[in-house]
Amino acid sequence: MGSRCAKLSTGHGPAQNTGHSRGHESSMKKLVACVSQDNFSLSSEGEEEEEDEEEEEEEEEEEEEEQIPVKGKLLLLEPEKQESAEDGEAQPSPEPKQTHS
């Protein structure tokens, strides 16, 4: 994977010296080709490795899922408390204003 990219990147080095505009165009095309080659090699060669990684990630995700509902409940409770506090403050505040006027 990396070796292919290295060869391509070194190949477009002298091309930039001959013409900057052409060099940039060719380098971009070669970069795209390099990326596509990496994707193909990853999808074909790395399937077995990815499966092992996914199993580890699933275990971590399960722990996160257990924590998310707890956080969600806390987040839901916080706005309710704020609203009730605002309502409590909002109701008595107009009363003194009325007495002043």
UniProtKB/Swiss-Prot annotation:
The modification Phosphoserine is found at S93. Testis. Residues 45-67 have a biased composition (Acidic residues). One of its GO terms (cellular component) is nucleosome. Its main location: nucleus. It comes from the Eukaryota. InterPro entries: PRMP3. One of its GO terms (molecular function) is DNA binding. Keywords: Chromosome, Developmental protein, Differentiation, DNA condensation, DNA-binding, Nucleosome core, Nucleus, Phosphoprotein, Spermatogenesis. The keyword Nucleus applies. Residues 1-101 are annotated as: Disordered. It is found in: Nucleus; Chromosome. The keyword Kinase does not apply. GO terms for biological process: cell differentiation; chromosome condensation; flagellated sperm motility; spermatogenesis. Protamines substitute for histones in the chromatin of sperm during the haploid phase of spermatogenesis. They compact sperm DNA into a highly condensed, stable and inactive complex. PANTHER family: PROTAMINE-3, SPERM PROTAMINE P3. Belongs to the protamine P3 family. This is Protamine-3.
